[in-house]
Amino acid sequence: MKRAILIVLDGVGIGELPDAFKYNDEGSNTLVNTAKVVGGLNLPNMGKMGLSNIEEIPGIPKEEDPIALYGKMAEASPGKDSTTGHWEIAGLILEKPFPVYPNGFPKEIIEAFEKAIGRKVIGNKPASGTEIIKELGEYHMKTGYPIVYTSADSVFQIAAHEDVIPVEELYRMCEIARAMLQGDHAVARVIARPFAGSPGNFYRTPRRRDFSLPPFKPTLLDYLKQNDYDVIGVGKIEDLFAGKGLTSSFHQENNTEGINNIFKAWEKLREGLIFVNLVDFDMLYGHRNDPQGMTRALKEFDDALPDVMGLLSDFDLLIITADHGNDPTTPSTDHSREYVPLLVYSPNFKRTFSLGIRKTFSDLGKTLAEFFEVENDLCGESFLNEIEKGWKGS
């Protein structure tokens, strides 16, 4: 019986990539910089796995004898968004980045969208989601015009107050936008951003929904599903892969619920993969430049790790990584172009060591494909032989 849990800590990077300067991300290091600002991180369980052996993190001692294999992965695809990162983890490397709109969307797109939904829109610029509802929320409530905005990522976001545009209607607008945004304007994600509250006290509700492009070729998820493995998505995995390759999904409103869903998914798993995204690190703390919140979220996850590890039998795998960085200590409120940590744990490891710096996130997808013994056409280089060395102790 082959089983694996793959957990993506959304936005939890571990140092700038060599090309970070192209993205204005020099100096970004989500984990290390957060630790410096808060006076050190207390993450004993990830510490035991070798987190500080990847790069020394204030507050987390290096382990002489870590319980996991450890390393870091570089992103080969251009970009630094969740879709690009998750697709690359699952074995797809993008040759060109998804389109971005630093000056807002072209007039022809906005006019076509307005015609299709029968309403004017407001905004049409890059913005922080919390800031733009502060700025335009009251006007939106008076007019009923949805707020369209983007970010440094390839996203077309639509914000609407739940009392003005019901959530189901907002989702319908997103489906219209998704159908329109193809070809040269094929953004990675259209995102519904419902909010509530009153002027001066607006807040985003948990009913966000992503409408992603489907992957352009089969991913690890598809190959596993085709071979009758369970592929269970937890969190926004279903959204990021447009539902492709999954046998079932669990959604959640926060990391606490997401961690609980790992246990629910495990009860359902016969043989196969649980693919988890925990988004609070990114959504609540990275984008809002809140290193204290990031610290609390990391501690909550770390506290849950022993129970997650306790699920595993001898040759099961638990893998912890990220999809990009989102350094809460920099002036930017956007994602950062960073290496991501790689921690690989199995209860039966007799020896552990460094996996080094992987050239692409796809090494992880390729490794899991080989672990599950499925023929595939994925990018990347498998390191299953290293995992097997850990089991053999050789």
UniProtKB/Swiss-Prot annotation:
Keyword Cytoplasm: yes
Pathway per the UniProt entry: Carbohydrate degradation; 2-deoxy-D-ribose 1-phosphate degradation; D-glyceraldehyde 3-phosphate and acetaldehyde from 2-deoxy-alpha-D-ribose 1-phosphate: step 1/2
Keywords annotated in UniProt: Cytoplasm, Isomerase, Manganese, Metal-binding
EC numbers on record: 5.4.2.7
Compartment(s) of residence: Cytoplasm
Family of the protein in this entry: Belongs to the phosphopentomutase family.
Stated name of the protein: Phosphopentomutase
